[in-house]
């Protein structure tokens, strides 16, 4: 396990096995990163939101690029997510899927094994289908990452009172 500088890891997050977390990453409450059969790499300025599961299989590691946002309750399983992408809440990325730079996966979408979602494309549904590709999609993803960088800093700086029992 390797953890970079200026990283926020919530007390209720669980990180197991071969996991590399680069600088300025946020791992939020209830997230599980389990690199037990292969490796997980989380790129700089990425955020793994509440109750996300990141896992691998023997053939597929999980690779998240820089400034990637993985929304609440999503599952990323043996997938590759390139820079500035946004994975919507409750969505599922199955083994061998590839999410290219600036792509957005809509909430609740299921990206099937081996599927590629192109650069700056929005994909929704089950199974996920591309509905639009343009620069505005990539801009939305990039801005989400910036929002979470500010939020992560507030958590690191102790701006929020936390209660647990």
Residue ranges with predicted function:
Residues 1-3, 36-44, 50-52, 56, ...:
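Glycine-rich hexapeptide-repeat left-handed beta-helix
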């Amino acid at each position: 396990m390797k953890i970079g500088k200026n990283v926020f890891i919530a007390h209720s997050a669980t990180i197991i096995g071969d996991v590399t977390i680069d600088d300025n990453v946020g791992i939020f409450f209830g997230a599980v990163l389990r690199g037990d059969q292969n490796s997980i790499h989380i790129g700089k300025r990425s955020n793994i939101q509440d109750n996300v599961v990141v896992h691998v299989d023997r053939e597929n590691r999980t690779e998240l690029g820089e400034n990637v946002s993985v929304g609440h309750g999503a599952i990323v399983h043996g997938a590759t997510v390139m820079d500035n992408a946004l994975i919507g809440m409750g969505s599922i990325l199955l083994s061998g899927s590839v999410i290219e730079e600036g792509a957005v996966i809509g909430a609740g979408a299921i990206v099937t094994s081996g599927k590629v979602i192109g650069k700056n494309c929005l994909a929704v549904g089950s199974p996920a289908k591309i509905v639009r590709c343009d620069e505005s999609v990539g801009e939305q993803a990039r801005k989400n990452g910036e929002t979470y960088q500010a939020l992560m800093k507030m958590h690191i700086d102790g701006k929020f009172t936390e209660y647990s029992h």
